[in-house]
C-alpha cells in the first residue's frame, strides 16, 4: 500500500528512534526482521508501525545482576514510577479522563528509567560490599501484585531449599505512588483489566 521509498523512510526513522534510546542505555541494535501488515494503513502512516525488542546480554562474572528472586527479610520496595495506567486508560476509553492527567501519564511512560539505574549503581560503587538491590522486576502486563507474586514465588523456592521460612510482603497502601485522578476514577467504578487477577494475587500479600 505504501511506495518502497516511503517504507524505507519510515523504517529508517523507526530504527533511528530505537537506536537513540538504546545508545543512552549502552545497548546496541544488532539485527531484526520486518513484516508488512495486510491492513490498509491510515494516515499518518507512522502511527501504524509496530515494533518490539528482545534484549540479550552478557554479565561480567565480577558483578551481580538483578533477578526476580533473592528478596530478603526486611527489604523495602522501591517503586520507580506511579501506578494506575490501566485504570486511567480504561476511563479514557469512556472519555472520562481529564486531558492534563492523560498528558502527565504519557509523559511519565515515555521517561527512561536509566537515571534511576545509574543512581543505584553509584550507591553500589560507593560501597561495593553493600548489595543495594536484592531483587528487581518490571511492572507491566501483570501489574504490581502480579509481579510481586512472581518475585515471591521465585524467592520462596530458594527459601524452601535452604529450609527457611517463606517470605510474605506487606504493602502500605498509603505509600504506593499513583497517578493523579486514579483514586477518583476507582470511586467512579473504573478498573483495569487486571482487577480480577489482582484479587487472586492478594492471597500472597498482606
What feature does the model see in each segment?
Residues 5-28, 35-51, 62, 122, ...:
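Glycine-/charge-enriched secondary-structure boundary and capping motifs
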Residues 93-99:
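Gly-rich Lys/Arg/Thr-decorated short loops/hinges at beta-loop-alpha junctions or inter-strand turns
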Residues 52-66, 100-123:
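Active-site glycine-rich loop that binds ribose-phosphate moieties when present
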Residues 57-83:
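Acidic/histidine-enriched ion/cofactor-binding microenvironments in catalytic or ligand-binding pockets
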Residues 33-34, 55:
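A cross-domain feature marking catalytic cores of carbohydrate-active enzymes
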Residues 84-91:
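Short, Lys/Arg- and Gly-enriched loop/turn segments at beta-strand edges
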Residues 1-3:
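Short beta-strand-loop/turn "lid" adjacent to the catalytic site in phosphate-handling enzymes
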Residues 69, 80-81, 105-109, 134-140, ...:
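Glycine- and other small-residue-rich loops at beta-strand/loop junctions that grip anionic moieties
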Amino acid at each position: 500500500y505504501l511506495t518502497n521509498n516511503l517504507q524505507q523512510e519510515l523504517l529508517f526513522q523507526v530504527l533511528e528512534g530505537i537506536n537513540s534510546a538504546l545508545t543512552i542505555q549502552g545497548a546496541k541494535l544488532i539485527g531484526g526482521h520486518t513484516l508488512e501488515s495486510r491492513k490498509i494503513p491510515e494516515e499518518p502512516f507512522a502511527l501504524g508501525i509496530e515494533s518490539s525488542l528482545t534484549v540479550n546480554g552478557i554479565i561480567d562474572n565480577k558483578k551481580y545482576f538483578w533477578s526476580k528472586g533473592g528478596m530478603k527479610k526486611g527489604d523495602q520496595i522501591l517503586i520507580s514510577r506511579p501506578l494506575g495506567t490501566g485504570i486511567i486508560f480504561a476511563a479514557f476509553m469512556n472519555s472520562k479522563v481529564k486531558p492534563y492527567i492523560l498528558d502527565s501519564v504519557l509523559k511519565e511512560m515515555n521517561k527512561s528509567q536509566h537515571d534511576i539505574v545509574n543512581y543505584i549503581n553509584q550507591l553500589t560503587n560507593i560501597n561495593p560490599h553493600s548489595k543495594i538491590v536484592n531483587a528487581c522486576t518490571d511492572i507491566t502486563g501483570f501489574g504490581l501484585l502480579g509481579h510481586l507474586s512472581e518475585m515471591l514465588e521465585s524467592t520462596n523456592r530458594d527459601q524452601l531449599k535452604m529450609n527457611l521460612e517463606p517470605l510474605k510482603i506487606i504493602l502500605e497502601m498509603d505509600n504506593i505512588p499513583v497517578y493523579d485522578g486514579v483514586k477518583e476514577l476507582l470511586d467512579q467504578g473504573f478498573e483495569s483489566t487486571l482487577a480480577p487477577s489482582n484479587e487472586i494475587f492478594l492471597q500472597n500479600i498482606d
